[in-house]
């Protein structure tokens, strides 16, 4: 992986013009080094990232627009524009846009670990079916949690 270089990634651009479709959201990578990885995310209404754990990374989300409903270590919460979501490694978390407006936010993780490669893998799937996404994610140090039991 290349070392971090000085510079500016413009507002409507990603690294190397990359834009990924990840579970119905748009992720645009902004910076990448061994120590950290950041991306701009757009969550259309009704999209979500199911509860999961990053085993090798701390994750942060700075909210730019809209509201995300969260499940953080089993507790429900939410974040709106200007809020920072802190997600230490090994803490289960899920992100949900339950609103009727688009959510925009900036994510970053430290260290990068295998997340950049995971996003390429998910984006490249012909169909992002849950079983394949879960299996690929496990190979990249992100573990999705099973759904809660019926009636829970």
Positions of PLM-derived features:
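Glycine- and acidic-residue-biased ligand/ion/polar-headgroup-sensing regions
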Residues: 56-58, 62-68, 73
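A short, N-terminal "cap"/entry segment at the start of jelly-roll beta-barrel domains
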Residues: 1-37, 125-152
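Short beta-strand segments in beta-sandwich/barrel cores
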Residues: 47-49, 66-71, 85
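Conserved hydrophobic/aromatic beta-strand scaffold that supports enzyme active sites
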Residues: 38-42, 60, 76, 84-86, ...
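A hydrophobic/aromatic-rich effector-binding and dimerization subdomain
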Residues: 3-5, 108-127
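Short acidic-glycine-tyrosine-enriched beta hairpin
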Residues: 10, 74-92
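Ligand-binding loop in jelly-roll beta-barrel domains
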Residues: 69, 89-116
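Conserved short histidine dyad/triad with adjacent acidic residue
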Residues: 23-24, 39-54
């Amino acid at each position: 992986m290349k070392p971090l270089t000085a510079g500016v990634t413009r507002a409507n651009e990603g690294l190397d013009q990359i834009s990924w479709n990840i579970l119905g959201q748009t992720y645009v990578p902004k910076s990448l080094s061994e120590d950290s990885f950041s991306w701009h995310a757009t969550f259309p209404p009704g999209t979500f990232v199911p509860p999961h754990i990053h085993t090798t990374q701390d994750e942060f989300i700075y909210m730019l627009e809209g509201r995300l409903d969260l499940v953080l270590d089993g507790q429900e919460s939410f974040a709106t524009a200007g809020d920072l979501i802190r997600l230490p490694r090994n803490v289960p978390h899920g992100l949900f846009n339950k609103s009727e407006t688009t959510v925009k936010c900036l994510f970053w993780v430290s260290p990068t670990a295998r997340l950049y490669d995971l996003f390429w893998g998910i984006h490249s799937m012909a169909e992002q079916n849950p079983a394949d996404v879960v299996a690929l994610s496990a190979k990249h140090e992100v573990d999705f949690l099973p759904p809660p039991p019926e009636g829970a």
